[in-house]
């Protein structure tokens, strides 16, 4: 997991700009690349997991085609490579984008080509990619792209956010900055799809989720586990133990500790400090439902205090397998997966966790597991994740199996009507003042 800026034919010096997102990397120094013939600049901070050797982890790699890779491809060895960086770049150069359907992980890849900078995002936008529409520039976060020129407030985006909590589109708070949709690439400002779910090969759900968990335990840094006491994280924890692996389970103190201790007594119970509205807006960089952002920020901060750079969670299961109450009334899966996840939940999780240099790994969001959910008829998904309960009942204590969903909340972090008005004012002052 890393951070980057890439640009072509601009007057900006990326050497100075990249330091504004230095928190996205750790354990390796910034390294830049400039191609004066093409007018290309690439800047990158690395958070290595696969190989901690600075000569291997720091990008751009001098031994590879000028490019930047952000994310993780967990099955790179299975695909015949020594690192996931080499896997992503060489797969693109030798086999093209269609070969990305073999990847298990999440990624953003930027490649310097004769036609221009190509920016590629993963199947669901787990690693968000942003670009400017008026200059050739891309980055891991939208805020840094404001430095390439004036920006105009997108009032439609803001109105949607105030109404729904997020904007279900590639728009951002600024008209000149957009997000690349999941499974798409951008070249010269033109965005095109490359991902086809029909090309994802999967087997049975239990096998594929187990494989996803095993893959996400990899790397040379310890991986922690967020154990909420709910169904999704309990399933993930159960598969970790079935694989014979040890993992540090962390529970956020929200009154659900008794359920988490039904899963394991070996638990770190942490209390979350409050997060100011101003900090939440500054970290998230765009207006959003801050009621969910604030506890996520507090959790990421606590993980770093405990010394972890990666955390495994049950994120994605609700959207995929009908975990929300609305799923019993109508089939919202498509909008939940392809609007709410890539344009609300995943950018929120990326920014809040990476601000504290923490990589989030969600086994439910592997391509194979997602395809299972997409192929499952509504009747089998309807009713509080019925398919998950039937498939993994042996891993889940009875009280958890039959309880209703509870969101991540704490007594210290709630949003009152008065606070919501403060949020609105803070958003305006921070973004458009």
For the regions a language model picked out, list residue spans one by one:
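ATP-dependent adenylate-handling active sites, centered on carboxylate activation for C-N bond formation
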Residues: 8-10, 115-118, 198-395, 413
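PAPS-dependent sulfotransferase catalytic core
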Residues: 326, 396-432
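Cysteine-centered catalytic environments shared across enzyme families
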Residues: 1-270, 274-279, 283
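Short, hydrophobic/amphipathic alpha-helical patches that form generic packing surfaces
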Residues: 90-91, 159-165, 295-298, 425-433
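Short clusters of hydrophobic/aromatic residues that line enzyme substrate/ligand-binding pockets
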Residues: 58-61, 177-180, 194, 288, ...
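Short amphipathic alpha-helical segments
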Residues: 15, 389, 429-430
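Polar, surface-exposed loop/tail segments
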Residues: 29, 33, 83, 385-391, ...
């Amino acid at each position: 997991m890393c951070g980057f800026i890439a640009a072509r034919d601009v007057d900006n010096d990326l050497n100075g700009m990249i330091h504004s997102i230095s928190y996205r990397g750790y354990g390796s120094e910034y390294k830049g690349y400039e191609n004066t013939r093409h007018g290309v600049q690439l800047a990158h901070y690395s958070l290595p997991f696969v190989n901690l050797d600075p000569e291997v982890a720091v990008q751009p790699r001098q031994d590879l085609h000028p490019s930047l890779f952000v994310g993780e491809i967990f099955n790179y060895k299975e695909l015949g490579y020594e690192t996931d960086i080499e896997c992503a770049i060489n797969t693109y150069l030798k086999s093209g984008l269609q070969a990305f359907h073999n990847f298990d992980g999440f990624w953003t890849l930027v490649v310097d080509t004769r036609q221009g900078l190509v920016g590629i995002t993963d199947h669901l936008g787990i690693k968000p990619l942003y670009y400017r529409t008026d200059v050739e520039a891309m980055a891991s976060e939208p805020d840094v792209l404001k430095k390439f020129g004036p920006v105009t407030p997108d009032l439609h985006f803001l109105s949607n956010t105030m109404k729904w909590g997020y904007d279900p589109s590639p728009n951002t708070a600024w008209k000149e900055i957009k997000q690349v949709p999941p499974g798409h690439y951008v070249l010269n400002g033109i965005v095109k799809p490359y991902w086809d779910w029909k090309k994802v090969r999967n087997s049975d759900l239990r096998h594929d989720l187990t494989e996803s968990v095993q893959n996400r335990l990899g790397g040379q840094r310890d991986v922690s586990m967020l154990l909420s006491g709910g169904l999704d994280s309990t399933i993930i924890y159960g598969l970790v133990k079935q694989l014979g692996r040890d993992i540090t389970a962390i529970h956020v103190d929200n009154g659900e500790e008794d359920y988490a201790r039904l899963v394991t007594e070996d638990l770190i119970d942490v209390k979350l400090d409050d997060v100011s509205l101003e900090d939440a807006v500054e970290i998230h960089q765009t207006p959003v439902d801050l009621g969910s952002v604030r506890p996520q920020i507090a959790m990421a901060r606590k993980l770093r205090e405990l010394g972890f750079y990666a955390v495994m969670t049950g994120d994605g299961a609700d959207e995929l397998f009908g975990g929300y109450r609305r799923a019993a009334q109508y089939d919202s899966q498509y909008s939940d997966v392809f609007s709410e996840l890539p344009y609300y939940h995943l950018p929120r999780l990326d920014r809040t966790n990476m601000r504290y240099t923490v990589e989030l790994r969600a086994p439910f969001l592997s391509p194979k597991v997602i395809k299972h959910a997409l192929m499952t008829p509504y009747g089998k998904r309807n009713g509080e994740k019925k398919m998950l309960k039937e498939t993994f009942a042996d891993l889940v204590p009875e009280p958890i199996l039959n309880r209703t969903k509870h969101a991540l909340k704490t007594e210290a972090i709630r949003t009152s009507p008065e606070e919501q008005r403060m949020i609105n004012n803070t958003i305006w002052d921070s973004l458009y003042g």
